[in-house]
Amino acid sequence: MTFAELNEVRTLKKQIAAAKQKIAALRDSAESVTTKLKPTPKGTTVKSRLEMLAALTVDTEAEINNLQARLQQAVPALTEKILAEVHNNAEQTLMIYRYVACKYFRDIGFLMGYSERRVYQVHEQILKKIAVDCS
């Protein structure tokens, strides 16, 4: 298992969040487009700006759908890999919290009754056991 495979779910979730923020910004822009509030260059009508914003919104929504489909495939695949390569139940739980649920080490420690430092130590030991190169 590679570090990229471990972080795939986290990366997809970040990309989805960024795309959702982009859609929110595009919708805000579309709502504020008027000739009185924002001067537009000659030849650019409000209608064409709205069409451009609508097209960008549709493209971004399609990107989100694609990312969510990839995420739906990545979660079970990563869970399966973790369960296959990590044999201790507590270690499996830690890895699933970290890489599937995308929890912070502090939160994992709280959920599992460990100190944050202990979570880091156990995590490091697991990575060494499964020979993940984090560089």
Regions found by a protein language model. Give the residues of each.
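DNA major-groove recognition helices of helix-turn-helix
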Residues: 119-130
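Short alpha-helical "recognition helix" segments of helix-turn-helix
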Residues: 107-112
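N-terminal interaction/assembly modules
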Residues: 1-84, 132-135
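Short amphipathic alpha helix immediately N-terminal
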Residues: 87-101
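N-terminal positioning helix adjacent to the helix-turn-helix/winged-helix DNA-binding module
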Residues: 74, 78, 89-91, 122
